[in-house]
């Protein structure tokens, strides 16, 4: 009996797993080698500064009394399920789409794990120009941003089949 080989993008989920592993390893190292709020200069424009974020991007809702942790964890989980389903319906040959979805899934689940384990997300990457600092972020956040960028580029460059 010959089995039909799947042409769907399921194998790209391994890339999501890699993103999760890199994210969790980098956060483990940040927690063990950095001190909260004490920057370590890496480059003239880059510090590693340990920060715990109970909110979302740019610490949105970070000062609330705790409900936001459950809220953002639930959003991460639901979005990840939706994106996994989307990836399951994507052709393996759509590399940019598959890679973008995989990056977003990995990033969302990396931060989801932090919220479940610690009730906050560990951030440590601190880009700055002199005294101006961008919001501190992590590997998962980077994966999400790159993934969204790839999806946008894919959607702009792929001709629509609709009239």
Swiss-Prot record:
GO CC annotation: plasma membrane
Spans traversing the lipid bilayer: 9-29, 42-62, 67-87, 93-113, 137-157
Catalytic activity entry: Release of signal peptides from bacterial membrane prolipoproteins. Hydrolyzes -Xaa-Yaa-Zaa-|-(S,diacylglyceryl)Cys-, in which Xaa is hydrophobic (preferably Leu), and Yaa (Ala or Ser) and Zaa (Gly or Ala) have small, neutral side chains
Coiled-coil region: none
Pathway(s) it belongs to: Protein modification; lipoprotein biosynthesis (signal peptide cleavage)
Keywords from the named record: Aspartyl protease, Cell inner membrane, Cell membrane, Hydrolase, Membrane, Protease, Transmembrane, Transmembrane helix
Compartment(s) where it occurs, according to its Swiss-Prot or TrEMBL record: Cell inner membrane
Active site residues per record: 123, 141
GO MF annotation list: aspartic-type endopeptidase activity
Family according to the record: Belongs to the peptidase A8 family.
Protein name: Lipoprotein signal peptidase
């Amino acid at each position: 009996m010959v089995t039909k080989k799947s042409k769907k993008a399921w194998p790209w989920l391994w890339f999501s797993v890699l993103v999760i592993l890199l994210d969790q390893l980098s956060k483990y190292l940040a927690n063990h080698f950095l001190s909260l709020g004490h920057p370590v200069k890496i480059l003239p424009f880059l510090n590693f500064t340990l920060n715990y974020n109970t909110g979302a991007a740019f610490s949105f809702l970070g000062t609330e009394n705790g409900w936001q942790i459950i809220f953002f964890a639930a959003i991460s989980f639901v979005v990840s399920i939706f994106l996994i389903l989307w990836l399951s319906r994507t052709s393996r040959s759509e590399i940019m789409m598959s890679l973008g979805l995989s990056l977003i899934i990995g990033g969302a689940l990396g931060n989801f794990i932090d919220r479940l384990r610690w009730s906050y997300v560990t951030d440590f990457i601190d880009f700055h120009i002199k005294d101006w600092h961008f919001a501190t972020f992590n590997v998962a956040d980077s994966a999400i941003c790159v993934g969204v960028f790839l999806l946008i580029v894919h959607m702009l460059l792929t001709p629509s089949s609709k009239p």
